[in-house]
């Protein structure tokens, strides 16, 4: 059995506020409807001359182009499409972890992600945040104590704290994970919420240990209903994931991928 903690109730309250028309909840990471590219999407739909099919490969190529602008050099063979980052995280857990394994994440963890770990019987160890990201001294202590299978992090605008991990700390995190041979799952779906300053390179872009699995989604920055996310990793991982989630891919929206392809 499990129970809802006070923090989980707080998150539920934050998200319920997002549904009220009179307020925009900054805590729920739900954009104001007016900020979505509604006119652009409507134009794409009006000009659609065929039923969208086989959009997945075009989607992967477009994602490669987007990531190239972030100094991430990947091919379509390094990409697996999913509906959203929660699904990506769940599939990675299914593939790599067994009940009783440990994963380290930044504190606090949003309830949706905490539920993924809990439902799979994974022990979640959290590390406190500092103004520039995860407390790396406490992270190393946790690594030595629990021997985790993964480190899960959101270096850009961590949900829910909004903290951005500094460039120096990103480099140290990669060195620390490399020293202990622990893979990193980097979720980067909030990276476009920057309003000032320069965008910092992702962990994946700086990774010389080939230890980072990168997950991202267009869900937060594109209208709801167009759910397309992706996993970036080594080709052997992607090939295994393809076999694992071939059934789920049947339900990925070709229309949503078509709209994204045209918009990108």
Question: What positions do the PLM features span?
Answer:
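Active-site donor-binding loop signature of nucleotide-sugar glycosyltransferases
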Residues: 28, 129, 205, 217, ...
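Short, solvent-exposed loop/turn segments at secondary-structure junctions
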Residues: 29-33, 86, 110, 156-158, ...
């Amino acid at each position: 059995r499990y129970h809802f903690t006070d923090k989980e109730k707080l998150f539920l309250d934050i998200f319920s506020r997002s549904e009220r028309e009179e307020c925009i909840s900054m805590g729920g990471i739900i954009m104001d409807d007016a900020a979505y590219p509604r006119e652009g999407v409507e134009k794409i739909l009006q000009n659609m001359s065929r039923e969208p099919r086989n959009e997945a490969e075009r989607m992967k190529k477009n994602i490669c182009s987007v990531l190239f602008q972030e100094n991430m050099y990947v091919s379509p063979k390094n990409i697996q499409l999913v509906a959203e980052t929660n699904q990506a995280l769940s599939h990675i857990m299914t593939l790599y972890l067994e009940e009783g394994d440990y994963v380290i994440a930044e504190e606090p963890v949003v309830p949706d992600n905490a539920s993924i770990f809990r439902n799979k019987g994974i022990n979640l160890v959290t590390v406190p945040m500092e103004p520039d990201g995860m407390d790396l001294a406490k992270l190393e202590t946790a690594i030595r104590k629990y021997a985790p299978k993964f480190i899960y992090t959101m270096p850009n605008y961590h949900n829910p704290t909004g903290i951005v991990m500094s460039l120096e700390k990103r480099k140290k995190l990669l060195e620390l994970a490399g020293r202990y041979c622990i893979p990193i799952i980097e979720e980067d779906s909030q990276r476009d919420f920057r309003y000032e300053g320069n965008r910092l390179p992702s962990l994946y872009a700086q990774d010389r240990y080939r230890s980072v699995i990168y997950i991202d989604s267009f869900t937060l920055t594109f209208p709801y209903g167009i759910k397309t996310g992706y996993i970036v990793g080594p080709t052997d991982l992607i090939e295994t994931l393809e076999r694992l989630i071939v059934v789920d891919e049947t339900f990925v929206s070709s229309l949503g991928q078509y709209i994204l392809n045209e918009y990108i």
